[in-house]
């Protein structure tokens, strides 16, 4: 290579595989209903691009904005359009979860009465706290940044079912009840089997699960148990 003319730009194509699933899920038609005054095509392209990036090369929205030209077949969007996706996702959350639940109910052997539950934290490159953004115990050891806590329920196939967000200073044990109740509402279930790690093991949670006649498999440290146990 002796000059810039000797270098040929290459493009990324991985998002083409994701687009196949996107079309099978009929997500384009779903999000078009939430366009409002926005251009439906622009909205759908913005959401798909950010989703594809999250799957193939997770980055900040600003980084995604700067790197759009690398993706074959993608129509570049404005930074405002990409940030606007967050409002649409927040607005459509409950409808989207139910929409996807119906799809996976038909396409997979989902056992609605069984759910695996875990909690994680998502930090922000900021120290400004707000309604959900709070300082708390960070699982990624970013204790100098605000964060939110997310409780995630997945099915027997490892596919997410639903999630709930909590203020960043929420303890793991305090998230289980709301998430399980959401699962019951989503599938109109009377009884659920919850599988979780020891971080969710508390007297309050076990008492709740027993009082609602739910089954559960939750880790327990034998060293902390009584001799009778």
Question: Can you say where each PLM-predicted feature lies in the sequence?
Answer:
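Short, solvent-exposed amphipathic alpha-helical segments in soluble enzyme
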Residues: 131-134, 209-211
